[in-house]
Amino acid sequence: RNLKGLQYTALVPRDEFDHWLDGNHRLVQFVFHLGARTDTAEFNRVVFERLNLNYSKMVWEKCVQYGLPLVYASSAATYGLGEHGYRDDHAIVPFLKPLNPYGESKNEFDKWVLEQKQTPYFWAGFKFFNVYGPNEYHKGRMASVVFHAYKQIKETGKMKLFRSHREDFKDGEQKRDFVYVRDVARVLFYFMHHRKDSGIYNLGTGKARTFLDLARNVFRAMGKEEIIEFIDTPADIRDKYQYFTEADISKLRKAGYTDDFFSLEEGISEYVARYLIPDKCFGE
């Protein structure tokens, strides 16, 4: 469904991509490697090692072999509880402590990349923060909070949020850096043409917003009365629950990306009105 209305030359199963690239690399100008196993509740490390680490190494090595520039998806999950802040400084990568095997697999690849002597002539890894936007119907539990908020409000008329279990945060005041997928695409498109300043970058708006802000904007976009309930954060994740994430995007700006990002209000309004209410995908 995500491919409806889009233009593409070939659909290649992931297990055949290396052989496909061997035979077609002259037709390829740029590689975006964004696919991964992203389930933060999956604890089978073998799956992450195969799909997120070893597969990504293969893509990197093919890009080196054929002289292809590469952009790949890292993740803000690499930052763990933010003990070292949220700076995309290469020097802190070896010291980061992700909270789950997914985040660990992403950080392991970042570490591997920074150790490589042979690199594509241009490469960039992007630590995506909380991305939301069209074409996430297939993602189940791992879809964005905006998507789940819309679904919950549509089905029950209300929205449940985790209450705070810390004195320095009020209920619903936990913050995330929510970034609209159109902004993500714009940044990647910019680097496809820029092809300078290789490195690992944060990709968020640089402005953390509360879950209350998010919920209220979804209610407003749906034209519904605001009914928000607070529930306990499950005990098994309470100690590892992030209360604040915010991308430091100064490095992105220094690389020349100057466009404004969608505000949470703008992004949610467009996403709900243009895609969720009519049940449409981008391209339909």
Whereabouts are the PLM-identified features?
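Conserved Rossmann-fold NAD(P)-dependent oxidoreductase catalytic core, especially the SDR/UDP-sugar
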Residues: 30-33, 57-99
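Active-site Tyr-X1-5-Lys
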Residues: 84, 97-129, 148-155
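C-terminal substrate-binding subdomain of Rossmann-fold SDR/epimerase-dehydratase oxidoreductases
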Residues: 153-284
